[in-house]
């Protein structure tokens, strides 16, 4: 299980392969992270919010806007839910599913070894 961390790895596919390697047969792999909504208006609002509002809140409440700006930046190169599901299938996970939360703003990818 990994939460809000896979997109921060330099080799997210390698991270998934390692999770698969250490999982017991029949064990579940879960990946919780930010997603990429497919519905156009929601996607626009979501990414606008992440790019502008989240860093502003980070500056106001935590005095650290760059730490929160990083969320949007890290999503630009992250394949999100569909890319994670594809890699899970490629490494032979079974029963791969995507649970979409808040219109795919957050997602949980699940696979079984």
Task: Describe the predicted segments one by one.
Residues 10, 24, 113:
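Short conserved AdoMet
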Residues 12, 40-41, 108:
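Short glycine-/acidic-enriched loop or helix-start segments at secondary-structure transitions
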Residues 13-28:
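A short glycine-rich, Lys/Arg-flanked "PGG" loop and its adjoining helix->strand segment in the class I
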